[in-house]
From Swiss-Prot:
Compartments where located: Nucleus
Species: Schizosaccharomyces pombe (strain 972 / ATCC 24843)
Domain called Chromo: residue spans: 176-238
Principal cellular location given in the protein's record: nucleus
Annotated stretches, region: Disordered: 14-58, 100-156, 250-273
Domain of life: Eukaryota
Molecular functions per Gene Ontology: chromatin binding; DNA binding; histone binding; methylated histone binding
Protein name in the entry: Chromo domain-containing protein 2
Cellular-component GO terms for this entry: mating-type region heterochromatin; nucleus; pericentric heterochromatin; subtelomeric heterochromatin
Chain intervals with Low complexity compositional bias: 121-140
């Protein structure tokens, strides 16, 4: 018969063997089984379900048998004091559990803690690399954007990923494409051209913008096609020379010594007003669009008012050439249309005659038109 003192001692030994785990205490029936039954598993098995006592979860059969033998030694020992058996049994349980295998509950806690530490370490490493990558991207892209430079991050189940900076900065890195060039003009300081651009995906005319030529490096093909459709890009230096020479000749004409016989304030005022209008017309040309429509369209409009000579019906002016100075013999006439535009008829050295918008003449043969104006100027 198991005494209550012995039962308490057995339970205290098993509880002390695992400080982090509190198994159900032995019952009197279980304790008696451990004494009366000599099998290697009877004493520490639960009689309810036939499984090992919870204090021994996680131990192998040999280890459980070793503890069983210690319990038998304590219960039926023929040598040594009760205290010696007590210490021996307690030490055996502690030794086996600490050096061999931990209880399943402790093993699960340990594995959970290990996974948590690995996950925490992985998250910190990912956040560090992500922050460094975002910082590097920010320094590079004050717009340009190379999101593909970042190394791919391996997937990990159960991990809550941080949003990539690439998706957040998608709008800031959006690229704008030029759909077409609508018009062009010379800059006021004469340093180059400006182009009137229509942007792809923006159909509202208010979205069209004027941009300097040096800012249009991304649409050089459109610029080349634009000038090709207009007979070639005008020479900037010739336009500047034309502007200066026209302004100078206008100023000279306005201050020509007047004839003493017709010395009136009205005539002086008229000459100055006419020369000022001519200068303003050149200035307006420089500041305004060089081509409000293509040269071919202008040519068709001009031919409505003035037909070329029959001998020039099949003649095609060399619009691809930058200058016509060596090809044109002279400017024959200059006329003004109903809409205020000036057109000039020129004679080519090969004998052909053709009519063109005065702006084209300024671009292609400015010296010829100056010679015409000088030949027809009248002093009063």
């Amino acid at each position: 018969m198991v005494k209550s003192a012995d039962l308490d001692l057995m339970n205290s030994i098993i509880s002390e063997s695992d400080e982090n785990f509190s198994p159900p205490p032995f019952t009197v029936e279980e304790a008696e089984n451990s004494i009366n039954n000599k099998s290697s598993t009877a004493s520490l098995e639960s009689p309810q379900n036939g499984s090992w006592h919870p204090s021994l979860y996680g131990l192998s059969v040999p280890e459980k048998t070793h503890i069983q033998n210690s319990l038998d030694l304590y219960s039926h020992g023929n040598s040594g004091s009760q205290k010696t058996h007590n210490v021996s049994f307690s030490c055996e349980i502690r030794k086996v559990k600490s050096s061999k295998l931990s209880p399943i509950s402790n093993m699960e806690d340990s594995e959970d803690k290990k996974e948590e530490d690995e996950s925490s370490s992985y998250k910190n490493e990912f956040k560090s690399s992500s922050s460094a990558s975002v910082s590097s991207n920010f320094e590079k892209t004050s717009g340009s954007d190379d999101h593909n430079s970042q190394s791919p991050v391996p997937l990990n189940e159960g991990f809550e990923y941080i949003a990539s900076s690439g998706s957040e900065d998608k709008n800031s890195d959006e690229e704008f494409a030029v759909e077409m060039i609508l018009d062009s003009r010379m800059k006021k300081d004469g340093s180059g051209f400006q182009y009137y651009l229509k942007w792809e995906g923006y159909d509202d005319p208010s979205d069209n913008t004027w941009n300097d030529e040096e800012d249009c490096a991304g649409c050089l093909e459109l610029i080349d096609a634009y000038w090709e459709s207009r007979g070639g890009k005008p020479d900037l230096s010739s336009l500047i020379r034309l502007t200066r020479s026209r302004a100078r000749s206008s100023n000279e004409a306005s201050y020509v010594e007047k004839d003493e016989s017709s010395n009136s304030d009205d005539s002086i005022s008229y000459k100055r007003r006419r020369s000022r209008n001519a200068a303003n017309r050149i200035t307006d040309y420089v500041d305004s669009d060089l081509s409000e429509s293509s040269m071919k369209e202008k040519q068709s409009k001009i031919e409505k008012y003035m037909k070329s000579d029959k001998s020039s019906k099949n003649f095609k002016p060399p619009f691809q050439k930058k200058s016509w100075e060596d090809l044109v013999d002279c400017v024959k006439t200059v006329q003004q249309l109903d809409n205020g535009k000036l057109i000039a008829k020129i004679k080519w050295k090969n004998g052909y005659v053709s009519t063109h918008d005065n702006i084209i003449i300024h671009q292609k043969c400015p010296l010829k038109i100056i010679e015409y104006y000088e030949a027809h100027i009248k002093f009063t």
